[in-house]
Every structure is written in structure tokens, then in C-alpha cells.
Amino acid sequence: MNPKFIALLGSTGSIGRSTLSLVRQFPDRFKIHSLSCRRSIDKLVDQIKEFSPKQVVVEASDQVTQLRELFAESELEILSGDQGNCQLVQHPEVDLVVTGIVGSAGLSPCLKALEYGKDLVFGNKESLVLAGELFMQVAHRSGSLILPM
């Protein structure tokens, strides 16, 4: 069985850390393709070193600069903001998107993931409360699954 490649939004929060713990327990079933965080750059750096993702997303351009300096010798793609999150969830190698982003900030990348036929695991219910009907319609059209964590 081939492992599922995960795009993890909110990797440094509690949902993200729980997801990474699961990936550690089942390395033959899951691999991290991409990570995303808002502010906790130090935690993200540790996660990059451990999981070797192909892409990461941070919130601000100064954080992008900091990561590019730290990982100058790697092929890591470093993106920023909501647009970066939307870009990484649609990557062809991503099988599963796990989101721990709270509130409305996760709406755009979650919707984009569903549009691209990615299965989506919600670690929070805010996005479903805010746009659940729309998510269900898009998932039905694309064949995506929406799963609770």
C-alpha cells in the first residue's frame, strides 16, 4: 500500500502536532508533503528538519526570508499567506489535506482542496459551521471526502 501524502495546515498548533504524532506512528501509511503555520517559526523549523516536506507556508514575507536563509541548501519551496495555502493543497502529489486552522482563515484553502478532489480532514468545526453546505456541494461534485478528526 502506498502512503498517503498529507498537506497539513496549522502544523504547529495542537491539531497539527497530533497529526504529526500519528504520522510518526504510521510512517508506512502517511508522509508529510507540506506544512503550514501562522507564527511559530521555531516549531516549524523543527518540523521541517524532521519531516522534510516539499513545501511550507508561513504568514509573512519576513518569515519567508528567514526560512530561505535557513534552508538555502534544500529544495524546499517556501510560500506565504492564504494564497500559499491554496497553492499547496492543490499540489498533484497531495492526497489528503488536514486542517487545524481556526476560524474563517481556513475557508479558502479548504474549499480549494475540495475543488481539486482532495480528501479533507477537519480538526476544527468552525469552517464547517461557516460554510458546511458549500463544502458538501463541492465535495459531492469532486468526489472528495470530508472527514472529522
Spans of model-derived segments:
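N-terminal Rossmann-like dinucleotide-binding module
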Residues: 1-56
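Short acidic-hydrophobic, aromatic-tinged amphipathic segments that line or gate anion-handling sites
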Residues: 57-59, 77-84
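Rossmann-fold NAD(P)-binding glycine/threonine-rich loop
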Residues: 67, 104-116, 125-147
